[in-house]
């Protein structure tokens, strides 16, 4: 089996968490990382044993060192990077949330048109237990008329990107609320 060489765009908290997940996966390795600042990319690369660091996501996509891109950036720039990766022949794993339905449709069209895979980063929908829950609902509950849901986490300081509407147009509700909304429609 060929090893899938990942490039990670972004070096924040979720990108650090994802590094361990990629390394634990069979036939996967992190081959490159990009950040707006080279020193940040190099620090991430050193921490996670990544051989290539870039200060431009476009240069990383254009390189031949990666087969797939994990996009862990603010929502405001995610679509552009996902589409560029697809056009560059790279498979795309885009972190959630996405800006809008039309945005996701453009990303999936770019992936389809370029023969690459697309997945969103809502981890639980790709987990086998989600299929079990759906089957249980179908077998025992039938149509669900109402859903009550809660999700919380510590946002940390006010420097968190979720407080910046230019970077995260939907703010914390787009990030945390995404889980609740996705669970309801799944």
PLM features per residue range, with description:
Residues 1-48:
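N-terminal Rossmann-like dinucleotide-binding module
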Residues 32, 52, 68, 146:
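Short, Asp-centered acidic motifs that coordinate Mg2+ and/or phosphate
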Residues 50-57:
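Conserved SAM-binding strand-loop segment of SAM-dependent methyltransferases
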Residues 68, 74-75, 79-123:
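Beta-strand-loop-alpha-helix segment that lines the small-molecule cofactor/substrate pocket
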């Amino acid at each position: 089996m060929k090893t899938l060489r990942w490039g990670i765009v972004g070096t924040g908290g979720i990108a650090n968490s994802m590094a361990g997940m990629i390394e634990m996966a069979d036939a996967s390795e992190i081959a490159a990382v990009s950040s707006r600042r080279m020193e940040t990319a190099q620090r991430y690369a050193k921490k996670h044993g990544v051989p290539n660091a870039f200060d431009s996501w476009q240069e990383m996509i254009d390189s031949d060192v990666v087969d797939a891109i994990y996009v862990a950036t603010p929502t405001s720039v995610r679509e552009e990077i996902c589409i560029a990766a697809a056009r560059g022949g790279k498979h795309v794993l885009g972190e959630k949330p996405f800006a809008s339905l039309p945005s996701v449709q453009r990303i999936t069209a770019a992936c389809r048109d370029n023969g690459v895979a697309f997945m969103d980063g809502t981890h639980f929908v790709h987990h086998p237990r989600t299929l079990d829950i759906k089957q249980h609902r179908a077998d025992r509950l039938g149509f669900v008329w109402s859903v009550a849901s809660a999700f919380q986490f510590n946002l940390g300081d006010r420097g968190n990107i979720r407080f910046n509407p230019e970077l995260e147009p939907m703010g914390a509700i787009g990030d945390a609320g995404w889980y609740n909304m996705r669970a309801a429609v799944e």
